[in-house]
Regions:
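ATP-dependent adenylation/nucleotidyltransferase module used to activate substrates
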Residues: 1-147
Length: 147
């Protein structure tokens, strides 16, 4: 990290507050060893059990980027889950993302639900946030994704 983040704070050892937050809040729960495998297996078992008799046992949000694409593949092919793929089209989809979603959903034999946000409304909201000059200009889009 560097000082391009105007609110960053470095301690006497040169370690930034973002790194300290990671060490304090994330790292204690980040198990990349057998413990993590057991925790994942337990969670997947609970998901499967809750999904017995249902068409889907989970929902996966997919943008078409590498992270959500890999998660979708992993859930279906490696973990044996039956996800419904959910995509929010807020007007910013690249053709590459759309192609990735279609190829992965078709290739894995999954169902896709796409929620299309009114582009005119989203554009006006994002423009208002941009003109206001405040932080977090992606707030309207983020709210649509998590609503």
């Amino acid at each position: 990290m560097d000082t391009s983040d105007s609110q960053i704070v470095f301690d006497e050892h040169g370690v930034c507050d973002h790194c300290r937050t990671f060490q304090r809040k994330i790292q204690p729960n980040w198990h990349t060893d057998e413990r993590g495998e057991r925790e994942l297996s337990t969670l997947v078992s609970r998901i499967r059990k809750a999904g017995v008799g249902k068409e889907y046992d989970c929902i996966i949000g997919m943008s078409g980027g590498i992270d959500s694409s890999y998660l979708t593949y992993l859930a279906k092919e490696k973990l044996g889950l039956r996800p419904l793929v959910f995509h929010v089209d807020a007007g910013w989809n690249s053709q590459e993302a759309v192609n990735n979603i279609e190829r992965l959903v078709d290739g894995l034999g999954l169902d896709l639900y796409t929620e299309v946000i009114d582009w005119e409304e989203m554009r006006d909201l994002q423009l208002a946030f941009f003109k206001a000059g405040g932080p977090h200009i992606d707030t309207p889009q983020d709210h649509a994704f998590f609503a």
